Amino acid sequence: MNKTNDIDQLIYLFSKLPGLGIRSARRIVLYLLQDKDVRLKSLINHLIELDKKIVKCEICGNMDTKNICHICSSEHRDKSTIAIVETVAELCAMERSGNFKGLYHVLGHNLSAASRQNPRILRLPELLKRCFVENIKEVIIATNSTLEGQTTAYFIIEYLKEHPAKISRLASGIPIGGELDYLDEGTLSAAINLRQPCE
């Protein structure tokens, strides 16, 4: 795309968001600009407020308005179970299912089978420390069913072998190559309920 002016540059930026192409981005930008005093300024103000308020949870990596997120600080969560997810989008998908009441560990990345990425980017030392300090009984690996997600899962299983917690994976029903954020709540609930132990 030839980014010749400010509008084209804004369209290009929107097109880089997940799930948006050039056409969708153009529609969004033109919609915002049609009533910029209301729509565009409202969006800008909300983005500025989000930038000021949102922080990464010091414990799990979730995004929240507090240093310890509402999930980690809740008295109503099962503190003996941690689900490992790749991103906050997958955490939100698990929460939407309404079927998981434990804690989370957000990796922030996954490991590519072909690349030589440093596994420390997954914050696994912090996870292992949490497992020991918080006396975790079960770790549910809820990575995506993509090649990268599977590679990441196998690495995590090996890494956590020194901890006595039960390690399980989400059950079948998640298609190979599927991402948790795109699953309906029923499929994800079944995958959580029927999770399989990792041997």
Curated annotation (Swiss-Prot):
PROSITE patterns in the cross-refs: RECR, TOPRIM
Q: Which GO terms describe its molecular function?
A: DNA binding; zinc ion binding
Q: Which residues are in the Toprim domain?
A: 80-175
Q: Which CDD domains match?
A: TOPRIM_recR (cd01025)
Task: Give UniProt keywords alphabetically.
Answer: DNA damage, DNA recombination, DNA repair, Metal-binding, Zinc, Zinc-finger
InterPro entries linked to this entry: DNA_Rcmb_RecR (IPR000093), Rcmb_RecR (IPR023627), Rcmb_RecR_Znf (IPR015967), TOPRIM_dom (IPR006171), TOPRIM_RecR (IPR034137)
Q: State the source organism's domain of life.
A: Bacteria
Q: Which Pfam families match?
A: RecR_C, RecR_HhH, RecR_ZnF, Toprim_4
What are the start-end ranges of the zinc fingers (C4-type)? 57-72
A single BP term in Gene Ontology: DNA recombination
UniProt similarity note: Belongs to the RecR family.
Q: Which HAMAP family match?
A: RecR
Q: What does this protein do?
A: May play a role in DNA repair. It seems to be involved in an RecBC-independent recombinational process of DNA repair. It may act with RecF and RecO.
**Record's protein name:** Recombination protein RecR
Name the species this protein comes from. Answer: Rickettsia typhi (strain ATCC VR-144 / Wilmington)
